[in-house]
C-alpha cells in the first residue's frame, strides 16, 4: 500500500497525496458533474497487448479541476496519470492496465472512484463518480493456457454497500424496445446536430447567433453520443 493513502480509497498510481478524501468537508457550492467514458470498464484476459482500458474524463466547466483516481483493489491495477488537472472545457485520457489477469479474478467486480476538486483547495471535493470494473475470461478454453483455477474468488469492497463482489450478467446483449430505440435515435440525432453547429466565437458563419454553441456543449454532446454508441454496439 502506498504511503499516505487510506486503506479504503487507496490511490493506484504514482504520487499518492498525504491524505484521503473520506474526511474532507462536503462542497459548499454546486456539485460538478463527473463525465467519464466508458461508464464501466471491461477487461479481456486474452487481449493481445494485455488487459487495458482507456478512460476519458471531461471537464465541461470554465475552471481548472484537479482529479484523482482511487480503487477498491489497487494491487490489481496500474493507472497512468492517476492524478492531475483537467483544463476548462477539455478532456484527458487515463490508461488503466489490469496487472493480475488470473482465473481467480475472472468476473470479480471492482470499483474505481473519480474525484474532482477545485484547483488550490486541497481536500474540497466538488464531484465524484464510481465506475465498475471486471475482468472477462478468454474466449478460448483455459486448458490452452495451462491454468488450473477457473473459479473466481470475490473480494469485499471497502467503500461500497455490498460486502461481496457481484459479477456482471453473462448476457451483455439485451434487446432494445422500439420506444427506447426511437428515443436513443432522437438523442443521437440531437447530439450530432450539436456537433455540427458552429462555435460561439466562430466568424463567417451564415447561421444566426442563437444557433452557435459553446465548446462545453459540444463536449457534452460528444459524451452522450459515445454512450449511445456503446448501447447500440452491445445490442
Swiss-Prot record:
Topology in the lipid bilayer: Multi-pass membrane protein
Gene3D superfamilies xrefs: Immunoglobulins (2.60.40.10)
Subcellular location: Membrane
SUPFAM superfamilies on file: PapD-like
Domain MSP: 33-145
One Gene Ontology cellular component: cytoplasm
Transmembrane domains' residue ranges: 180-200, 213-233
Entries under InterPro entries matching the protein: Ig-like_fold, MOSPD1/3, MSP_dom, PapD-like_sf
Residue span of region Disordered: 1-30, 143-170
Superkingdom as given in the UniProt entry: Eukaryota
Keywords, sorted A to Z: Membrane, Transmembrane, Transmembrane helix
Protein name: Motile sperm domain-containing protein 3
Originating species: Bos taurus
Lineage of the species this protein comes from: Eukaryota, Metazoa, Chordata, Craniata, Vertebrata
Gene: MOSPD3
Amino acid at each position: 500500500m502506498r504511503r499516505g493513502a487510506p486503506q479504503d480509497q487507496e490511490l493506484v498510481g504514482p504520487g499518492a497525496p498525504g491524505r484521503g478524501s473520506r474526511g474532507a468537508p462536503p462542497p459548499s457550492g454546486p456539485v460538478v458533474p463527473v463525465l467519464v467514458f466508458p461508464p464501466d470498464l471491461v477487461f479481456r484476459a486474452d487481449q493481445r497487448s494485455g488487459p487495458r482500458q482507456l478512460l476519458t474524463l471531461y471537464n465541461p466547466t470554465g475552471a481548472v479541476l484537479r482529479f484523482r483516481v482511487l480503487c477498491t483493489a489497487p494491487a490489481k491495477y496500474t493507472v497512468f496519470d492517476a492524478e492531475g488537472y483537467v483544463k476548462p472545457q477539455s478532456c484527458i485520457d487515463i490508461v488503466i492496465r489490469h496487472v493480475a489477469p488470473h482465473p481467480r479474478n475472472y468476473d470479480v467486480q471492482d470499483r474505481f472512484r473519480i474525484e474532482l476538486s477545485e484547483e488550490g483547495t486541497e481536500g474540497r471535493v466538488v464531484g465524484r463518480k464510481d465506475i465498475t470494473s471486471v475482468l472477462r475470461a478468454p474466449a478460448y478454453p483455459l486448458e490452452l493456457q495451462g491454468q488450473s483455477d477457473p473459479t473466481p474468488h470475490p473480494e469485499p469492497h471497502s467503500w461500497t454497500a455490498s460486502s461481496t463482489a457481484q459479477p456482471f450478467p453473462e448476457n451483455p446483449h439485451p434487446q432494445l424496445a422500439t420506444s427506447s430505440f426511437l428515443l436513443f435515435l432522437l438523442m443521437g440525432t440531437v447530439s450530432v446536430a450539436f456537433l455540427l453547429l458552429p462555435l460561439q466565437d466562430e466568424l463567417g458563419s451564415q447561421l444566426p447567433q442563437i444557433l452557435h454553441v459553446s465548446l462545453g456543449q459540444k463536449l457534452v454532446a460528444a459524451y452522450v453520443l459515445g454512450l449511445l454508441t456503446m448501447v447500440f454496439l452491445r445490442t
